[in-house]
């Protein structure tokens, strides 16, 4: 029920419902010059997308992302330029007048506001908010004589010829009034579409594109019609639905249900969100039967109907910061810290970018807007950078040349992250399995300058541990015993703890073999073990013959750890 020609007004809400909390709009901390630059730049970008949308009939970005950026622009304008209203630009060729104006829908998401709206009205009905493009159909003496796009609500494009090629739009009606007007949604017909899992799939843009093509395509046969308004139609909703069904508009009756409370609306909203449907939806519409006469309708929000939208599959968030971490093997990972948002039932404030090189390709910095969705197993995924701020802050990233498979076996300020990652791996279940030694404990020892390299802890005394702030006698004793238990571990456990790149399927290759024998193995001999190919064999041999690893093994040998 929405096309890119509506005027969006910012709605600031304070509550949330249905597991989808609303977030109050916060004005950016910008001076007027910066605000003007950002507002102008985003407005120009939206206008470029509008031009593509109207001239080529396709959307360069997802519909729900466009909607959110349009709302973002209006929010900024409310903050810094409240005297200006920034509507979406309309196509130049929308000159066909509507016999009855298309109204808009006020969108509510606050529980208190929704309940209040419902209790103040009677004879209410709920429908799915079908996501397509709005149209006016005019019938005279049972014959379709006009079809007009929504446009600005007062006039739009003449779609009559295209409408006559859509099988789902009846051309001739029997038993119809002599002259009447319908308003509805042209949608892309789907098979068992589940909104919660599949999202909008840009169905709206596909329909809009087809309706603006000069030459018809097979897509026309995939377009359906959902009638949601009959200006000056039967007064009672049951009579209105029966008459629509009799004339060939049965879908409206199938998906319009009486409600008496907010709980009823919530039930249908959840049902349609998860159930297979023949169309894409982006929420529900709650409407009262009583409406003013069509001649009084205006292209503003109606007061007899409201929308309660679903959370978008792709949510737009501001990038607050860029965080870098260096892992055990020296790989630099990048994570974006974003303004908190809700995806399904998950609160998300961080999203993984991947490698340093990928972050540079994304060119994403604080102040940018990114599109985020849920990937498999509910993991937040960065989909795209949908808007870049006009000012590009300088972010100093780690030099990836400083980190590799053999860096940071010794502590330094630069090495802190990789060094800690090595220790966490060493004490974990894949290594020595040392009780009580997790990242927090290793950090405490590092902060007390007790760890010069990855073996320094082996020589700590109980007294040194007891001197660590907040340790206590019993805790110090337990940690000391845990650390010393490593002396009883085999050489194979130690090699795995230090990071030898032997896959778990080939761990038997390390059992009951001394250091010299391991070093003397050839690449061909290593490849005899499960999961070890040519490249992995070379990595294992490089590990066994690296000077720092050889030094560490020599120290273990002095401690009686041979095989």
Curated annotation (Swiss-Prot):
Catalysed reaction, written as an equation: NAD(+) + (deoxyribonucleotide)n-3'-hydroxyl + 5'-phospho-(deoxyribonucleotide)m = (deoxyribonucleotide)n+m + AMP + beta-nicotinamide D-nucleotide
Pfam family, one: DNA_ligase_OB
PROSITE patterns, per database record: DNA_LIGASE_N1
Transmembrane segments: none
Protein name: DNA ligase B
Native source species: Pectobacterium atrosepticum (strain SCRI 1043 / ATCC BAA-672)
Family assignment from sequence similarity: Belongs to the NAD-dependent DNA ligase family. LigB subfamily.
NCBIfam families: PRK08097.1 (NF005987)
Uppermost EC category: ligase
PANTHER family per record: DNA LIGASE, DNA LIGASE B
EC number(s) from the headed UniProt entry: 6.5.1.2
Single Gene Ontology MF annotation: DNA ligase (NAD+) activity
Single biological process term from Gene Ontology: DNA repair
Gene3D superfamilies xrefs: DNA ligase/mRNA capping enzyme, Helix hairpin bin, Nucleic acid-binding proteins
Active site: 129
This protein's UniProt keywords: DNA damage, DNA repair, DNA replication, Ligase, NAD
Protein purpose: Catalyzes the formation of phosphodiester linkages between 5'-phosphoryl and 3'-hydroxyl groups in double-stranded DNA using NAD as a coenzyme and as the energy source for the reaction.
SMART domains, per database record: LIGANc
């Amino acid at each position: 029920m929405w096309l890119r020609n509506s005027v969006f007004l910012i709605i600031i809400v304070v509550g949330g419902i249905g597991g989808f909390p609303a977030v109050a709009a916060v004005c950016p901390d910008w001076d007027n010059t910066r605000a003007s630059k950002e507002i102008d730049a985003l407005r120009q970008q939206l206008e470029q997308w509008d031009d593509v949308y109207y001239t080529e009939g396709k959307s360069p970005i997802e519909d729900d992302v466009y909607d959110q950026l349009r709302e973002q622009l209006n929010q900024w304008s409310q903050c810094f330029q409240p005297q200006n209203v920034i509507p979406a630009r309309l196509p130049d060729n929308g000159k066909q007048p509507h016999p009855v104006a298309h109204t808009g829908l006020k969108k509510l998401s606050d529980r208190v506001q929704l309940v209040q709206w419902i209790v103040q009205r009677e004879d209410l009905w709920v429908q799915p908010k079908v996501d397509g493009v709005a149209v006016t159909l005019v019938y005279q003496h049972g014959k379709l004589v006009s079809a007009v796009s929504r446009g600005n609500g007062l006039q739009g494009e003449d779609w009559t010829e295209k409408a006559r090629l859509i099988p789902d739009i009846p051309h001739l009606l029997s038993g119809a009034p002599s002259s009447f007007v319908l308003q509805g949604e042209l949608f892309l017909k789907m098979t068992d579409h589940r909104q919660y899992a599949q999202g909008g799939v840009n169905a709206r843009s596909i329909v809009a594109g087809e309706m603006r093509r000069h030459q018809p395509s097979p897509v026309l046969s995939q377009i359906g019609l959902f009638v949601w308004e009959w200006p000056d139609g039967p007064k009672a909703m049951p009579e209105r639905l029966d008459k629509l069904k009799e004339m060939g508009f049965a879908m409206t009756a199938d998906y319009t249900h009486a409600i008496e409370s907010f709980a009823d609306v919530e039930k249908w909203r959840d049902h349609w969100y998860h159930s297979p449907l023949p169309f894409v939806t982006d929420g529900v519409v709650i409407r009262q039967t009583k409406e003013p006469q069509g001649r009084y309708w205006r292209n503003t929000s109606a007061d007899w109907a409201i929308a309660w939208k679903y959370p978008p599959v792709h949510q737009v968030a501001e990038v607050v910061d860029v965080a870098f971490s260096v892992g055990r093997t020296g790989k630099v990972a990048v994570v974006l810290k974003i303004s908190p948002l809700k995806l399904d039932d998950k609160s998300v404030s961080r999203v993984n970018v991947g490698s340093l090189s990928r972050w540079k390709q994304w060119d994403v910095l604080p102040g940018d807007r990114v599109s985020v969705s849920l990937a498999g197993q509910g993991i937040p995924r960065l989909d795209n950078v949908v808007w870049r701020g006009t000012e590009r802050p300088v972010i100093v990233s780690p030099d990836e040349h400083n980190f590799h498979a053999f860096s940071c076996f010794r502590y330094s300020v630069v090495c802190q992250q990789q060094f800690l990652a090595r220790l966490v791996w060493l004490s974990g279940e894949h290594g020595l399995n040392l009780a009580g030694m997790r990242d927090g404990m290793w950090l405490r020892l590092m902060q007390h300058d007790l760890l010069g390299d990855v073996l320094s802890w082996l020589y700590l005394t109980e007294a040194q541990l007891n001197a660590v702030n907040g340790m206590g006698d019993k805790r110090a004793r337990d940690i000391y015993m845990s650390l010393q238990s490593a002396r009883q571990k085999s050489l194979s456990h130690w090699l795995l703890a230090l990071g030898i790149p032997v896959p778990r399927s080939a761990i038997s290759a390390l059992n009951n073999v001394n250091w010299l024998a391991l070093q003397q193995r050839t690449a061909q001999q290593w490849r005899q073990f499960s999961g070890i190919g040519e490249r992995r064999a070379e990595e294992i041999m490089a590990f066994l013959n690296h000077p720092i690893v050889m030094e560490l093994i020599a120290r273990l040998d002095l401690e009686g750890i041979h095989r």
